[in-house]
Amino acid sequence: MLEGMSLGVAPRQTDVFATTTSFCEGRVAPDSIYGLLHRECFGLFPDEMFADLFCDVGRRSVPAMIVAVVMVLQRIEGCSDREAVERFTYDVRWKYAAGGLGFDYPGFVHTVLVDMRARLAASERPDRIFEVVLQTAKRAGLVGRRRVLDSTALYDAVATMDTVTLVRSAIRGLLGACAADLEGELRGLLGRDDDYRTAGKPVCDYDDPAEREALVHALAEDARALLGALDGRQLTAAVARAAELLAAVVGQDLERGDDGVFRIARRVAKDRIISTVDPDARHGHKTSARGFDGYKGHVAVDPDSELITATKVTAGNVGDAAPAPDLLADDLPDPESAGDGEPAAAVESALSVYGDSAYGAGALLDTLEQADAQIVCKVQPPVAPAGRFAKDAFAIDLEAATVTCPAGQVTALRPLSDGQIARFGAACTDCPLAARCTASPDGRSIRLTAHEAQLARARARQSDPAWKADYRATRPKVERKIGHLMRRAHGGRRARVRGQTKIDADFSLLAAAVNLARLAVLGLTHQTATWAATSA
């Protein structure tokens, strides 16, 4: 026999005085993103903040503050547009986060979110949600002068195409972009028995080399015929873009042999387009052994508050150091305003920048040195094949423009278009250390980049034990933040949209949502005329 317990009876009358606020108080944690948005949504995202996106007359929109809150929650929970509006309608936490709306507050159609994204994209401040959240954190004193940089792979939302599919899809795209009259004219030039109206790979016995080669050549001839007919014409923007894409695809993947037959090129183009559906996507590598297709999401993080201070999305084949100046643009001194001869450090503390060896590029080091920043970016040591003498075994005197080898031979540096070179030549012939230095019959040569001095200074800095301790204690914090961004609950690494511009905006919105979740933990509150963090 179980212990005594009376039967619970379901209530048949609701509490007509209950609100989302009274219901959620005590149930929703105050340090959750829902609790923060409930308290501060009107201060963070006032309707006036979006006034420039709308007209002065016309049908009233859904309140912009509510849409902004839904967009933030949608991004941090990884919802589709339809899922987001459904949760706003039925999940009480979402209405609580939007200022404590009533249980019966009406929902809206998912196209409202599509429309708001389009309006933001067409505005002068497309990333204003991220900017406002970051500015709020700065006013609360949560953003210091240290930045950690890193990047992560973002997988594209399309299938990677092989050469045959790529060329055929580009032809199909060009025909589809043309007006009816021009399309009819171009179709009369096609030689293949293919109307190019359906997507997919053409029928062919791909195991037969001759048939496969004939298909590739026929596709190339169709592409040449179309491009030749359009050459020199006044084209619409859409047709011009489609023609440029077709020309790029054919040029990167096909080459004409001496017999006049087009074949698939036995090389990989440097900036190869991998899909006509998303022409901005590229093959990328985070390591030599791990590749991906799509984009890179770059972030700058404050390691003390663990807030994201900047984001940038690039094609997957762009190096990590290339967008670093953009990530630091708001933190580096403005060259136009720095004309008083007084260093930036006199106004505020010097900027400290941390990064792994991907950020140890000479051009970035030069930019940071000119900004008087403290550089904590790792630089790879020079290497040589088969364990031979590396560059650091040579004494390089940039002022005297000479290089001294381990055997004591001295040679002059000669200028190149992108740096300098020292060639030892005949001096290596009878050198007792030649076997440990070079296998070239022309002797050893040492090539210097245009930023050799910056690289040398960086290598000297990173030999300091204090530098190493600071680097090891600080840089890994960005890895944890990237882990937060790439959680499966937020949508993971797979891009939700197509095109670099849209993915950039989506990544910025995700960073804003993650920052808000972090600010909630730090206890962000609005106190009279300013912001403060009670738990920082």
Placement of each model-derived feature along the sequence:
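Basic, low-complexity segments
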Residues: 1-57
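Helix-boundary capping/turn motifs
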Residues: 42-43, 60-64, 87
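Short, hydrophobic/aliphatic alpha-helical segments
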Residues: 50, 91-92, 464
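Alpha-helical support elements that line or immediately flank enzyme active sites
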Residues: 66-78
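Anion-binding and metal-coordination hotspots
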Residues: 80-86, 101-102, 106, 111-536
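Catalytic micro-motifs at enzyme active sites that drive phosphoryl/nucleotidyl and oxygen chemistry
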Residues: 59, 97-104
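A short glycine/serine-rich beta->alpha loop
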Residues: 53-60, 497-500
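DNA-recognition alpha helix
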Residues: 84-96
